[in-house]
Amino acid sequence: MTGSKDYVVADISLAGWGRKELDIAETEMPGLMACREEFGAKKPLKGARITGSLHMTIQTAVLIETLKALGADIRWASCNIFSTQDHAAAAIAEAGIPVFAVKGESLEQYWDYTDRIFQWADGGLSNMILDDGGDATMYILIGARAEAGEDVLSNPQSEEEEYFYAQVKKRLKASPGFFTKQKAAIRGVTEETTTGVNRLYQLQKKGLLPFPAINVNDSVTKSKFDNKYGCKESLVDGIRRGTDTMMAGKVAVVCGYGDVGKGSSASLKGAGARVKVTEVDPICALQAAMDGFEVVTLEDAAPTADIVITTTGNKDVVTLDHMRSMKDMVIVGNIGHFDNEIQVASLRNLKWTNVKPQVDMITFPDGKRMILLSEGRLLNLGNATGHPSFVMSASFTNQVLAQIELFTKGEQYQNQVYVLPKHLDEKVARLHLDKLGARLTELSGEQAAYIGVTPQGPFKPEHYRY
């Protein structure tokens, strides 16, 4: 591991490799490159001090350098202990941007790195957060509540929370008053994923959201593309790299049929698997059934499944009892944000055999074995390299526009959760059409008037469901 005052990466000598992949990724990320061209001279993020907590991949490196080109100062960590691509982190460190991310870092290191992205060399404070899953945001908010005298650190509910609370206590002791000052300095947060967005909406509902937030996840050009088409390519990639299993003919159970579940089901179906879906929502269940999938309960499907994948963003979706009922050598994995979709903690007293990084074989008392991918964390990033660059360009272009919006116009926003306006969603999509050779048909003035829009758009009302 290579560490200094300004970065911690696995091996700084990987920077050259990372830079080569960055150069390739830029050609697949037209939205971000267009942002550099449009905003680079104006530097709308000059003065922004962005704390970023998002998977430290090659694609994220292109995002980071785009934010830098637009004037921002940045400190970055990964939002998952397994998702870092070490050569990407090295390239960013070599470019002089503080980054703290190592593939396979411990939970203790994870929360230490989350703390370090708020610790600026000049002793100043962050004024923006770019988050994925909400950990950076929650770190500051929980710390501020503890400083205010609330009893929020005494009862951790998981191993993750134990390390989280320990790091908060460490910072409380080292820098009294830090969290309260840091919370007050934040102009806004932009949140990447479903899980983090849910946390923000819960804070808003309770009146505990202390700054404006933009829900990037629910931009159409994020959720309907990254969540669906990204998973469609990266899920099977992760399973194959982790297990080398043949998926054709196998029975795969996908828990959840939201956007991630839809992409995951399509991914497995495309690989030839016989896919079954579990759902709690009757609308999503009906969609799955009419897309040709058998809708089942996990209790019924677990004994015959060869592959079980969770996609829900909920907890305890796959329980110990479910896993006990599964066949020998079943493959179990998760593509939702946190590791608690699968009751991994309940397996810790069993025999674990590490096959290779992020692949473990767990043996039950009756001799049955289970292959667990990435310890129940995001397998597409732990066992593979995540979504392709092109689809991440759409997601990250939304992030750039959201950061500009909150940093430059933050006073126009209340302490609520917002989504980007429709015209920006359409702009993001438009920026990616040329790369695919797609040409838009143009409305005449008469046609536009007939359906109540302008020829330039927006073309759909806010309530339209794509």
UniProtKB/Swiss-Prot annotation:
Binding site for NAD(+): 193-195, 227, 256-261, 279, 314, 335-337, 380
Listed PROSITE patterns: ADOHCYASE_1, ADOHCYASE_2
Signal peptide feature range: none
Cellular component aspect of the GO annotation: cytosol
Keyword Cytoplasm: yes
Catalytic reaction annotation: S-adenosyl-L-homocysteine + H2O = L-homocysteine + adenosine
Names of the cofactor(s): NAD(+)
Listed EC numbers: 3.13.2.1
Predominant place of localization: cytoplasm
NCBIfam families: ahcY, PRK05476.2-3
Protein purpose: May play a key role in the regulation of the intracellular concentration of adenosylhomocysteine.
Protein name, per record: Adenosylhomocysteinase
Organism, as annotated: Mesorhizobium japonicum (strain LMG 29417 / CECT 9101 / MAFF 303099)
Source taxonomy: Bacteria, Pseudomonadati, Pseudomonadota, Alphaproteobacteria, Hyphomicrobiales
Gene: ahcY
